A protein has these predicted regions:
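Long, hydrophobic alpha/beta structural blocks
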Residues: 170-171
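Helix-coil boundary and N-terminal low-complexity module in membrane systems
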Residues: 1-123, 157-164, 174-202, 206, ...
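Short, charged/polar low-complexity linear motifs in solvent-exposed/disordered segments
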Residues: 49, 124-126, 212-214
Length: 311
């Protein structure tokens, strides 16, 4: 039974958080995430080893590693969104390309959300500036402080929900402004339902992550305990010795190996919060009229463009 058939068999709760383990059995997402994180880890390790030659190498390789990790995360997110929707899987390479091409949209959406939240904080600062007036200022603060606290709290709630579902919206094929508008509609109409699902999913993800990292950590200690008397102690950062396989640089190689183990485990575990976002998006985007929201957003953008053109 493929994932589409499993989804059809769960029509009552097609986007339940108890579908989280499906993310770990989706080998396409595991492959995309694991390959990107493993490659990023190798690039980071290579950059640290070349740091003694020039500071340029760790900077460039670190930046490339960051892009690779984010692109892989995005590609895995596209795959998990397909899984949540019950759509047929694409190829692993297709998900890698989709993740890479999603990066500009994700960056744009992130910047717009930061600007919106910054605008809220600027508004709060302006109100407080008005309340600084002598005489009437203290009276205004009596009313302003509760309203400002409520405003910032609602902004934080909306920002938290939006951050969790805007990415999956983009992975689902939505344009940036459409994704933000739909996320705003979900936040406005289903704030506590959405945040409850997100928090519940993240708690389950955290429990599983603790189990995985606990197992990996204990296993690493056992291997390290066996390696210490066999290999010996020492951490000489000698690149030629590491490549040549002699001297205490064995421990440098072991350190790189441990880093790769934890990077790979992280890639595996991080699939779960991605699945939480995908399931939340799929459930609540079906509860709003996406077509009407898209049309209203396009109309508003056309009005803005027309007014800008007049100047």
């Amino acid at each position: 039974m493929n994932h589409a058939q499993r989804l059809l068999a769960k029509d009552d709760h097609p986007y339940s958080i108890f579908r989280l383990p499906e993310a770990l059995s989706c080998w396409q997402a595991v492959a995309v995430m694991g390959a990107s994180y493993l490659s990023a880890g190798l690039l980071g390790a290579l950059g640290s080893m070349l740091a003694h030659t020039s500071i340029v190498f760790p900077l460039l390789l670190g930046l490339l590693a960051l892009v690779l990790a984010i692109a892989g995360t995005s590609g895995a997110g596209v795959c998990l969104t397909d899984l949540a929707r019950g759509r047929p899987y694409r190829g692993v390479l297709s998900y890698c390309v989709a993740g890479l091409f999603s990066l500009p949209k994700l960056v744009g959406a992130g910047l717009l959300m930061l600007l919106l939240y910054g605008a809220v904080l600027v508004g709060v600062a302006l109100v407080l500036l008005v309340c600084k007036l002598p005489g009437i200022g203290p009276v205004l603060l009596v009313v302003a402080v509760p309203l400002l606290v409520l405003t910032v709290a609602l902004a934080l709630l909306g920002y938290y929900v939006a951050v969790s579902i805007v990415g999956p919206a983009i992975w689902d094929g939505e344009r940036v402004m459409h994704a933000l508008s739909i996320a705003w509609s979900i936040t406005r109409n289903h704030p506590f339902e959405a945040i409850g699902k997100i928090v519940g999913g993240l708690l389950l993800s955290g429990i599983f992550a603790a189990m995985v990292f606990g197992l990996v950590g204990i296993s690493s200690l056992i291997v390290g305990g066996l390696a210490a008397p066999i290999i010996g102690v020492g951490m000489s950062l000698d690149w030629s010795a590491l490549v040549g396989g002699y001297g205490s640089s064995h421990w440098v190689g072991a350190g790189v190996g441990y880093a790769l183990v934890f990077v790979t485990a992280s890639a595996f575990v991080f699939l779960l919060p991605l699945m939480v976002g995908a399931l939340t998006w799929c459930e609540f985007s079906d509860k709003v009229d996406r077509g009407t929201i898209r049309s209203a957003t396009d109309s508003a953008l056309q009005d803005v463009n027309a007014r800008v053109a007049e100047f």
